[in-house]
């Protein structure tokens, strides 16, 4: 159960970093 919590926190942190970079510098591959 503890591993699930740690993985959730890790994914959440990586997700926040990814979205912050994504919205700060929008990729040009979409258009």
Swiss-Prot record:
InterPro entries: PSII_PsbT (IPR001743), PSII_PsbT_sf (IPR037268). One of its GO terms (cellular component) is photosystem II reaction center. GO terms for biological process: photosynthesis. Keywords: Chloroplast, Membrane, Photosynthesis, Photosystem II, Plastid, Thylakoid, Transmembrane, Transmembrane helix. The keyword Iron does not apply. It is a single-pass membrane protein. It is found in: Plastid, Chloroplast thylakoid membrane. Its main location: plastid. The chain crosses the membrane at residues 3-23. PSII is composed of 1 copy each of membrane proteins PsbA, PsbB, PsbC, PsbD, PsbE, PsbF, PsbH, PsbI, PsbJ, PsbK, PsbL, PsbM, PsbT, PsbY, PsbZ, Psb30/Ycf12, at least 3 peripheral proteins of the oxygen-evolving complex and a large number of cofactors. It forms dimeric complexes. Belongs to the PsbT family. Found at the monomer-monomer interface of the photosystem II (PS II) dimer, plays a role in assembly and dimerization of PSII. PSII is a light-driven water plastoquinone oxidoreductase, using light energy to abstract electrons from H(2)O, generating a proton gradient subsequently used for ATP formation. This is Photosystem II reaction center protein T.
